[in-house]
Amino acid sequence: MTSSNGDNKGLVVSFGEMLIDFVPTESGVSLSESSGFLKAPGGAPANVAIAVSRLGGRAAFVGKLGDDEFGHMLAGILRKNDVDDQGINFDKGARTALAFVTLRSDGEREFMFYRNPSADMLLRPDELNLELIRSAKVFHYGSISLITEPCRSAHMKAMEVAKEAGALLSYDPNLREPLWPSPEEARKQIMSIWDKADIIKVSDVELEFLTGNKTIDDETAMSLWHPNLKLLLVTLGENGCRYYTKDFHGSVETFHVDAVDTTGAGDSFVGALLNQIVDDQSVLEEEERLRKVLRFANACGAITTTKKGAIPALPTDCEALSFLKIQVE
C-alpha cells in the first residue's frame, strides 16, 4: 500500500525496527510488581514514520517483521496510519521483537527486550526495496540496526542507495545500551556512520554517553560536529532542545505538561522536524524559521508524553496547532 497523504509532498523513508512495547498499567513499579500491561506498537524508526504521516506528510517504513500475529498487526498499524508498507519483509523463522517497559513515577522508562534474534535483526541487503529507498527525499534511521549482521549490511546498503539518490540523511542513534555487547561497541558502531548524516539528533543522555562528558554545553555538543553536517540537535527533555548549524546555534524552550510516559517523545519531535523540512531544506539555513519549526517539534514531543505508549500518543497537525494556540493564549 502506498501513502495516501498528499502525493505532491516529498517522501520520508524510515529504516529499522518496529516492535511491540508492553507498557505497565501503573507507574513506579518494577516489571515483576506490575499487575498488567498494555500492548503498544513501537520502535523508533516506525514511530517517526507514523509521526510524519499523522502530521499530513508522506512516509514509508523499511524493515523486517516476524511472520506472526504481532508482525502482521504492526504492518496493519502502518497501513492504518497511511504509512507506505512496501518496504516490509516478513521472516518465517524469527519472531517480532518485544520490549517490556518499566515506567518510573516521573514517566521515564527502563527496558527489557526479547529479541535474540528477532525478525528485524535478520533483514538482508537483497531484501531491500531499492526503488522505494531511491524515492526518498529524507532517509531516516537509528543505530539498533547496526548491532548485528545481516541487518547491519542492509542498513549500510540502504543508506548508500538513499544518499546516491540525493536524499537528506537523518540519524537518531536512539541508544538502547542493553542491546549492545558492550558500551564500547555501542560507541564504536554509533560513531562509525556519524559523518554520513546531514541531520543528527541526540538526547542529553546520548551526548554524555558518546562524548564521556557530563557537562551538557555547546562545547560538548560541537565536539560531535562533522564538516558535512547541516543540523545537530540535542534534546533536553523538559528543558527543550539546542540546535547547531555551521552558521548559528541556540536553544528553544519546550512546553510543560503532566508527563505520563515519555516513550516516543523524541520520535514525535523528529517526525515533526522532518515533515517540516522535507520539501524546503532552506529552513536549515534561516534561524528564525528553524526556531519556529523546532517550537512546533517541541510541542509534538510534549503532547506525546501525555498518553501511554508511543504511536497512540503521536499528535495530528490539528492537535499540535491547537496545543500551540492554547500556549499563546
UniProtKB/Swiss-Prot annotation:
PANTHER family: FRUCTOKINASE-2-RELATED, HEXOKINASE FAMILY MEMBER. Belongs to the carbohydrate kinase PfkB family. One of its GO terms (biological process) is starch biosynthetic process. One of its GO terms (molecular function) is fructokinase activity. It is an enzyme of class 2 (transferase). GO terms for cellular component: cytosol; extracellular region; plasmodesma. It comes from Arabidopsis thaliana (Mouse-ear cress). May play an important role in maintaining the flux of carbon towards starch formation. The keyword GTP-binding does not apply. Its EC number is 2.7.1.4. Pathway: Glycan biosynthesis; starch biosynthesis. This is Probable fructokinase-2. Keywords: ATP-binding, Carbohydrate metabolism, Kinase, Nucleotide-binding, Transferase. It catalyses: D-fructose + ATP = D-fructose 6-phosphate + ADP + H(+).
